Amino acid sequence: MLYPQEFDVIVVGGGHAGTEAALAAARMGSRTLLLTHNIETLGQMSCNPSIGGIGKGHLVKEVDALGGAMALATDEGGIQFRILNSSKGPAVRATRAQADRILYKAAIRRMLENQPNLWLFQQAVDDLMVEGDRVVGAITQVGIRFRARTVVLTAGTFLDGKIHVGLNNYSAGRAGDPPAVSLSARLKELQLPQGRLKTGTPPRIDGRSIDFSQCEEQPGDGMPGGVNEGTLPVFSFMGSTAMHPRQVPCWITHTNERTHEIIRSGFDRSPMFTGKIEGVGPRYCPSVEDKINRFADKDSHQIFLEPEGLTTHEFYPNGISTSLPFDVQYDLVRSMRGLENAHILRPGYAIEYDYFDPRSLKSNFETRQIQGLFFAGQINGTTGYEEAAAQGLFAGINAALQCRGESAWLPRRDEAYLGVLVNDLITKGVTEPYRMFTSRAEFRLQLREDNADMRLTEAGRRMGLVDDARWDAFSRKRDAVARETERLKSTWVNPRNLPAEESARVLGKSIEHEYNLFDLLRRPDVTYDALTGMDGGKYASTAVSRETLGELSAPVIEQVEIAAKYAGYIDRQKDEVQRAFYYENLQLPQELDYMQVAALSIEVRQKLQKHRPETLGQASRISGVTPAAVSLLLVHLKKGGFRGFTAQQADEVAA
């Protein structure tokens, strides 16, 4: 039957990408339908029970700054929080949380069910409705046809998914869930360029069978013995520690030579080493057999025993993802200290699935071949909940904007890790599952977790993503930061009004001439609290006190202090951004035949002709396109007088 109601946006899949896509489109006012094969698995954490980490936590903060769900759900479900790299600079500090799977999923489900403009429907999608070169809807497994102006596909590992345990394999989207075979076949019919990737998960262990006295305890921040014992982190800009459930520790054990012998003995029955698995696995989350093979010189690897929740005994042994036969899994687990009597609740497995080359997507994640069809998440060759959530949000935003008849939202590489993620995917593609790191961002001093809201919330408000409560909190923070920064810049101290002993205590020596407080705060060893506490607190401001700002007080002071400490570095990076901006925004003529650009090598011509980048900046990031080739292309465009290009260039120069 044809469903009587028509939608603006249909989202296929209810994982981390699908939920953020559906929520974003609905927040923007689009009539949105989320189709999932099982409503009970909305927001399910299919692999590790954690959110965040280096680079990943930055993405979660950006999703949150745009009104997304992941950070708030983590605050509600997080049973251990840690700030990674806390001793390093703010650009690379990252929040990571262990999450209670049940609490996290319940938080996501509640947000979906209470979101205006969003309808949920339980049915697997088998086909797309395509008229000419445009998608017009989706068809479910029982033949229900839903019409829509746009479709966002977030199928995760379900596209022709195949699970491997030893030399045994079977079709599945994940353990216990069926694959999307018909939909995968339909996408192949549309001749979208695709490949195979794989990922894996470890066996789960019953905590009652673990001897924790033989393991090393790893408490989180805010817990006795934690690295930052006095401070319990919060993930969302709208979150609070009051939202957190009870906090619990993780535990650490290690593999040993016996473990490695057991693993090596199973290589002849490993689907990875016998050619049963075609797909490439994630480099930065390798299976334990891959680790033992690649790092043969290491006699031990750290294994983190992570609790799956407060109401279960299940533990996730992070570090032994495997597709080895179950008898090998059983022996390798029991060879480790503290796990000698471990009972395995679920076997580990590898899953192989289809992905589609993200270089065939436009800058807004719309497919080039089919108008109105957007891809997000693991279907684009990424790995990780956080990367999926960020892509889902991005695709949902742009599907809604297309329905409004508005131009796409395309954050730049200097504006957001989301911009880095999108740009990397559409220009470089993937040869292995893509994971975000801070090292992928050229301008990471500007792209910190702490300022994600300062970078993105205003854009989110303009697009309709940010509600009044979030906007009010952001506005108070932004205004307080501006006022306090200005106050410090206009407050002066000199040898006459600042006692020498106070100056020496806080600054290390007495001052000899006049300084404003902001300049003094730029000194590496001077903290905001010490500076404003000089001379009996004479320079403190009640405007940024906890009594005035409540929970916003600490983030405001942090922003002011970072702005002072890193002012010189950030200014230099802004100059680099300006230089990059010139190339980034130069639109390349769509009619340009790269094969006729004689100055370029055949390899470069072929790559440009194949990928057809939209801007000179995108062209510069295609693998094999050298800076010299970019310069030659620029010369060719200037000489050729391509329509719009020379005028556009003149506008840039004038600006």
Swiss-Prot record:
Binding site for NAD(+): 281-295
Swiss-Prot/TrEMBL keywords: Cytoplasm, FAD, Flavoprotein, NAD, tRNA processing
Pfam families assigned: GIDA, GIDA_C_1st, SAM_GIDA_C
Cofactor names: FAD
Top-level taxonomic group: Bacteria
Function: NAD-binding protein involved in the addition of a carboxymethylaminomethyl (cmnm) group at the wobble position (U34) of certain tRNAs, forming tRNA-cmnm(5)s(2)U34.
Name of the molecule in the record: tRNA uridine 5-carboxymethylaminomethyl modification enzyme MnmG
UniProt source species: Paracidovorax citrulli (strain AAC00-1) (Acidovorax citrulli)
Top-level taxonomy: Bacteria, Pseudomonadati, Pseudomonadota, Betaproteobacteria, Burkholderiales
